[in-house]
Amino acid sequence: MNDSKNPLSPHLQIYRWQISSLISIFHRITGIINVMGLIIICLWIGLLFFGESSYELINIFFQSYFGKIFIMGFAWSYSFHLLSGIRHLILDLGYGYEIKTANITGIIVIIGSLVLTVLMWLIGRGLI
């Protein structure tokens, strides 16, 4: 039992999420996803040395519905991490700490990552 007169912190029950904290958390998560995705891509390229049949097996995966979701997710993760990293570099220079500016740059990162993902997808499909 807590018999002290100190107030107890309600912690997460009253915490209001801010866009800056979400961008920071997702920056870390996308960094991990990017490393895992690059490992998978390196393994895919490494399968070239084991012959055409093993390489075709991975190609079948990438042409499947799940494979396309993986590629799209990896493209979004890369785009988000890139734009969020640029945002963090600007913050490191001391700019953008005002609440309004921080919210606007956070929204720019989210929308920009989606736009870059669509552009990568269109370029990859040969539509642009």
State where each predicted segment sits.
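Membrane-embedded alpha-helical bundles that constitute the cytochrome b-like, heme-associated redox core
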Residues: 1-128
